[in-house]
Design a protein with these regions (language model features):
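Long, contiguous binding/interaction regions
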Residues: 1-118
């Protein structure tokens, strides 16, 4: 408890936001980059991996329209682009990958990128 306006006690509570599995994996990749002196803010070659028996053709079409290079065969799709991977820049991209996986009934297995130090 802390004193609020006019000396009245206030209870402060922080809303806890549970991290998704992908949020945790994203943070782990960024932590590995940070250990190597990479803040993630410089755009770099980044790959995203999708697996499963869902609709890879539709994923490829949507991803190409969004500016990604796509490759893969059968039950594997890899999307490529050049982007920054710091948390603020990357969060919307990560959310988009997760929504594409759900929409096309695929497993989004995460991402990797080049290390860039300046």
């Amino acid at each position: 408890m802390a004193d609020g306006p006019h000396g009245a006690p206030w209870a402060f509570a922080r809303e806890a936001k549970a991290l998704s599995e992908h949020d945790e994996k994203d943070a782990a990749v960024r932590a590995a980059l940070a250990v190597q002196g990479d803040s993630g803010v410089t755009p770099r070659h980044t790959l995203f991996y999708f697996y499963g028996e869902g609709d890879h053709d539709d994923l490829n079409e949507v991803a190409r329209r969004a500016g990604f290079v796509t490759r893969g065969q059968d039950d594997v799709t890899v999307l490529e682009t050049t982007i920054p991977v710091d948390e603020a820049s990357f969060a919307p991209v990560s959310a988009m990958m997760q929504s594409w996986a759900a929409a096309f009934q695929l497993d989004y297995d995460g991402w990797e990128c080049a290390v860039v130090t300046n």
